[in-house]
Amino acid sequence: MSDTTLEKIIVLDYGSQYNQLIARRIREIGVFSELMSHKVTAKEIREINPIGIILSGGPNSVYDEGSFDIDPEIFELGLPVLGICYGMQLMSYKLGGMVEAAGEREYGVAPLQLTEKSALFAGTPEVQDVLMSHGDRVTAIPEGFHVVGTSPNSPFAAVENTERNLYGIQFHPEVRHSVHGTEMLRNFALNICGAKGNWSMENFIDMQIKDIREKVGDKKVLLGLSGGVDSSVVGVLLQRAIGDQLTSIFVDHGFLRKGEADQVMETLGGKFGLNIIKVDAQKRFMDKLVGLSDPETKRKIIGNEFVYVFDDEANKLEGVDFLAQGTLYTDVIESGTDTAQTIKSHHNVGGLPEDMQFQLIEPLNTLFKDEVRALGTQLGMPDEIVWRQPFPGPGLAIRVLGDLTEEKLETVRESDAILREEIAASGLERDVWQYFTVNTDVKSVGVMGDQRTYDYTLAIRAITSIDGMTADFAQLPWDLLQKISKRIVNEVDHVNRIVYDITSKPPATVEWQ
């Protein structure tokens, strides 16, 4: 967001697993919020011009050498500050209080007893459940602070210094276990920080269009269109901002879901008027992969070949200065914070060549996935694109175990279409986070029409999840599974057996390879 007049509350990142959740909760209230490194200085914050600051929780102990610190001048900015868990301990410690290891650690839900009236807790009950997760606790509060809430193991569970607009809570209001946590965050954002609460997808669109037009001017923009949610939303947003200055390249590598390529062209090219160059590269990709069985080799070849195809097409265009990408805020957080952990790489189709000298445009890089979907809806995009499931860059090719053949690929494409059809008809489409079929490369004996068969076994994978980092298998109704199995076996050639994957993540990953 380039607009410094935008009301925003910044969250300083101290390593809590709930950091993103804090920003999401504030945004749900209607106030823009973003994570920043705990190394940010008071001077830098003054330039950003936020209306409030939240110090997140984290795994450190404030008294340990090398623990995450804060510029003490931040407390002198006159801005409202809310310290959560470690953030509260750090604020107390830096301002003259004491923090020690708790004699009895406090993990899980605990009753919070309010002892005084407080603007932070306005409209919440005197006794309420909150989520505690700490091994240290404040044992003496700084001068000017007073206690407004206690818990069985935390005599200073909630403290404040109203003269300096400083607030500290030992629990996590951002998680649902803290029953009235959202009300506390709303009180902080709207009443204490004075936000109007009018941040929305509608004004996000207006601001982005203004930013894009100012940045691009009369120059041209290139977009790699995959047909997924992120690149599709970027395409429609850019089309609204700069019209025919945008050119999209859509590479059909032959591993898309049934009807997907046609839908992309009809919806984005037809209804929304995007100028799309469709590259039919199915034979080119398949020729490189025939007979290969190692999943990493397949991924690498698909990624590299995609880059070569994209590069070939991009070089045919003249006068392109900008490259648009569907980078999300989660990508920025994972790669750009001091506390981020390295996670398993996603099934990306590969990076672009280093010698492609474009300026980047990433209009979604301040949004979470659910906000991208909301943006797509606000832009008038159909549900079948906005709610499209996560799909790996290499596509159906990595849902075929063993060597890749046209026959096996077709079993996955056709069975996947049946699975999606039946789950949609059952009304469970939004309840199941992701679902697909896999050709296991295992053949088994069967009987069909009094004839012995020896055909493929397909697996159905369906999971429930919030963010894909962890997942449980979806407990689909047995009659639905039976119907899906019957249809696949009857309608898809070379398949005679269906199994259901009931493994959670971890220990399994979502995809089979």
Curated annotation (Swiss-Prot):
A GO MF term: GMP synthase activity
Disulfide bonds: none
Coiled coil residues, start to end: none
GO CC terms in record: cytosol
Keywords for the protein's UniProt record, in alphabetical order: ATP-binding, Glutamine amidotransferase, GMP biosynthesis, Ligase, Nucleotide-binding, Purine biosynthesis
Residue ranges of every copy of the Glutamine amidotransferase type-1 domain listed in the record: 8-198
Involved pathway(s): Purine metabolism; GMP biosynthesis; GMP from XMP (L-Gln route): step 1/1
A Pfam family hit: NAD_synthase
InterPro entries the UniProt entry points to: Class_I_gatase-like (IPR029062), GATASE (IPR017926), GMP_synth_C (IPR001674), GMP_synth_GATase (IPR004739), GMP_synthase (IPR022955), GMPS_ATP_PPase_dom (IPR025777), NAD/GMP_synthase (IPR022310), Rossmann-like_a/b/a_fold (IPR014729)
EC number, UniProt record: 6.3.5.2
Annotated ranges, domain GMPS ATP-PPase: 199-388
CDD domains: GATase1_GMP_Synthase, GMP_synthase_C
Gene3D superfamilies named in the record: 3.30.300.10, 3.40.50.880, HUPs (3.40.50.620)
Binding site residues for ATP: S226, G227, G228, V229, D230, S231, S232
Catalytic activity: XMP + L-glutamine + ATP + H2O = GMP + L-glutamate + AMP + diphosphate + 2 H(+)
Annotated active site: C85, H172, E174
The protein's assembly and partners: Homodimer.
Record function comment: Catalyzes the synthesis of GMP from XMP.
Protein name: GMP synthase [glutamine-hydrolyzing]
Organism annotation: Lactococcus lactis subsp. cremoris (strain MG1363)
Lineage, highest ranks first: Bacteria, Bacillati, Bacillota, Bacilli, Lactobacillales
